[in-house]
């Protein structure tokens, strides 16, 4: 599944909204925001996909 801005993903009952996807130096970074706390985070796409599951019926 292609990660896109605006998608909602979850982990351990917490929801995260993808706020940006950026390619830098042969790596894809995913920037995302915790929907409950508002804290923003980023990690490599591979790590993001290993940690989170997409919520397919919501944007």
Give the residues covered by each predicted segment.
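Basic/aromatic-rich interaction segments and small domains that mediate binding to polyanionic partners
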Residues: 12-45
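Short coil-to-beta transition motif at edge beta-strands of beta-rich domains
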Residues: 1-12
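Intrinsically disordered, low-complexity, charged/polar segments
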Residues: 37-59
